[in-house]
Amino acid sequence: MNYAYPDEKGHYGIYGGRYVPETLMQSVLELEEAYKEAMQDEAFQKELNHYLKTYVGRETPLYFAENMTKYCGGAKIYLKREDLNHTGAHKINNTIGQALLAVRMGKKKVVAETGAGQHGVATATVCALLGLECVIFMGEEDVRRQKLNVFRMELLGAKVESVAAGSGTLKDAVNEALRYWVSHVHDTHYIMGSVLGPHPFPQIVRDFQSVIGNETKKQYEALEGKLPEAVVACIGGGSNAMGMFYPFVHDEEVALYGVEAAGKGVHTEKHAATLTKGSVGVLHGSMMYLLQNEEGQIQEAHSISAGLDYPGVGPEHSLLKDIGRVSYHSITDDEALEAFQLLTKKEGIIPALESSHAVAYALKLAPKMKKDEGLVICLSGRGDKDVESIKRYMEEV
């Protein structure tokens, strides 16, 4: 399969690109240049690997979920344990890389957006480590849902700005963070949290997250002497999935499954299933599939999981859907909750609600596969942050 994206203009087929105001163009070009240089620099790679190993705690285990496998009665189920990273999710793979890039570019300050708070915490964490000033924008609805993470960020020295505009969720936080970056661009780096935004962000985030798929490949081959037959990951903006899928894109014998949030159901207004129900448009500097109405107004996305309710999806996922290399599915709030409880009870591992969507789809897929086949789930984060809202949800039900 001939797959080499993005092109030199930052396009993935028709998707991606740089739809930014003139005031930002210079900055994204400067970032692209700095990133290319860093990727060629052995000292930078060495420093990044040092922090990934000794600070983040990589490599993360590839765990054979024996009880889940028996329960499903089909393929062997493996979990790639990104929940065991420092700060409890895959987000730090990217923030540590981008923060080192910010230092390299001589920036003193970092701005970021956050939904569930995981990216915010991971950003505040690396800023504390590297002595960078940190400003985090978070929708007020998410601030309410994720009080603990807000407190964590503040403990780490970050300034958390609550965003009341729009629906008060991730999309609005990205808007404000981009605005802030425009006016502080001389001394500030924007750490985009997912494979979104203008080029080179989707590529940078994908490359820093690819450590997930690269490790998985190596670990699975060591255990089974072959590649897995299937790989499953959840998708909001799509960074854990892109990090898991990208190293497998050329291995066409490996089926790749992306799992979006169907919320209350894709037949309702309350979902975040962009690739299932969306259409093409431009948001936050990039062309991608979006949830929008006939007039092109962005619709509100809904999911029980704060990390999946983004109304768009990374441009590379948009392309991978069109060319059929990844098949995209969606899982409802209720199915995700069921999977959350099942994994907790069967394996003693409490997954994030985001990751529970991937687990839920794997539970449907595994029984249809043969016993000598393997299925890897990217367990993108731990569920500590969700226990409170799940308790509330279950009491209401």
Curated annotation (Swiss-Prot):
It catalyses: (1S,2R)-1-C-(indol-3-yl)glycerol 3-phosphate + L-serine = D-glyceraldehyde 3-phosphate + L-tryptophan + H2O. GO terms for molecular function: tryptophan synthase activity. It is an enzyme of class 4 (lyase). GO terms for cellular component: cytoplasm. PROSITE patterns: TRP_SYNTHASE_BETA (PS00168). The keyword Nucleotide-binding does not apply. Keywords: Amino-acid biosynthesis, Aromatic amino acid biosynthesis, Lyase, Pyridoxal phosphate, Tryptophan biosynthesis. InterPro entries: Trp_synth_b_CS (IPR006653), Trp_synth_beta (IPR006654), Trp_synth_beta/beta-like (IPR023026), TrpB-like_PALP (IPR001926), TrpB-like_PALP_sf (IPR036052). SUPFAM superfamilies: Tryptophan synthase beta subunit-like PLP-dependent enzymes. Its EC number is 4.2.1.20. Its cofactor is pyridoxal 5'-phosphate. Pathway: Amino-acid biosynthesis; L-tryptophan biosynthesis; L-tryptophan from chorismate: step 5/5. The keyword Iron does not apply. Belongs to the TrpB family. Tetramer of two alpha and two beta chains. This is Tryptophan synthase beta chain. It comes from Bacillus cereus (strain G9842). The lineage of its organism: Bacteria, Bacillati, Bacillota, Bacilli, Bacillales. The gene is trpB.
